[in-house]
Every structure is written in structure tokens, then in C-alpha cells.
Amino acid sequence: MTYTPLEPTYFFQDSWMAKHLYDLKPSHHYDVGSSAKTMGILSQFTPITMIDIRPIELELDNLFFKKGSILELPFKDNSIETLSSLCVVEHIGLGRYGDELDPYGSEKAIKELKRVLKVGGVMLFSVPVDCENKVYFNAHRAFTRDYILELFEGFQLLEEKYHYGAEMFASYEPQKGFGTGFYMMKKS
């Protein structure tokens, strides 16, 4: 039997994101650096502003664009109700997208995401996970669950899911090796 080719990470990630954004029903959602294709689809039921260092050329009702860096977001402290950043922070500081090399790029990006999310606001976040913190040079980093939760200290973990291979799991299973973690968190 021949199957339709799919990239499982983005299939699971985008479905997970859509479910939560639909359930949350924010008046306006903000996304930093994720897929323009995904945000375009989701903008059809929730107004979305995308923030990225690379502008998009297309226009779509309910989809707005703001040029900006995840290291210096163009928003006031505690100003955003719902925020997402899907498979983005693991690239920051590795030079892959023309950014400067910085061994703490991911940590600085997370600090900035935390800064702009209002108290009581919800963060939808995904990153590669592994059995230890690693750098796959010039591609991305991978993190342990404990390290991610440490970086989001002061946030309440509402849900976590993990993708390994072609399956989703409800718990972190480091013995499975490389995967992707999906986290829904509320700022306390």
C-alpha cells in the first residue's frame, strides 16, 4: 500500500495548535516565527498577527504581519493574551537564519516570549526534545523536558504532548531519543 507522504512533526504540531487555538478563542492571537501557511489557515477563525524577521509578501483577511525579532519583540511587557512559537527557539543563536551566533540564543528568546505574555495569558510552544540538551550545529538545539520547564518557571503547565516517530504520546519518554515536545502553559 502507498501512503500520502507527510512530515509527521508538522502534521501533529499544526493539528495540536489548531485544536487549542480554536478552544481558547482569543480575540487576537500573536505568533512568533512559526509557519506562515499554518497561521494563514488558523487566521480564518481567529485574527492572527505574525512576528518574524522575514516579511511575507501575501495578504489575507485576519492575518497581519509585524516585522520583529524574537530577541526584541515590538510589544510592551505583559501585553499579549495568547502567544505561540512553534519549533522556532531551537534555531536562535546558531546563525542559520542570518542571526548572530549566541550560545544562549534560545534562552534569551524564551525570556522575551515570557516578557510580552500577560499574567493569565496562554503560551503554545514547541521544541525538539531529547534525552539531554544538545546542539545539532547550524540546524537546531534539542532540550530535555526538565530544562524547558525550568526556563518557563512561574508558568503553569496545562498540557504537554510529545511526538516520536509517527506517534503522539502524553508523556516525555527520553529513552525514545529525539522527538518534539508540545507545551501549553499559562503565565502565573
Q: Residue locations for each model-derived region?
A:
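A conserved beta-strand element that flanks and buttresses the S-adenosyl-L-methionine
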Residues: 84, 89, 93
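A short acidic, Gly/Pro-enriched loop at the edge of an enzyme's catalytic core
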Residues: 71-83
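Acceptor-substrate binding/catalytic loop of class I
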Residues: 103-104, 125, 130-147
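A short glycine-rich, Lys/Arg-flanked "PGG" loop and its adjoining helix->strand segment in the class I
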Residues: 101-122
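Core SAM-dependent methyltransferase catalytic element
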Residues: 168-188
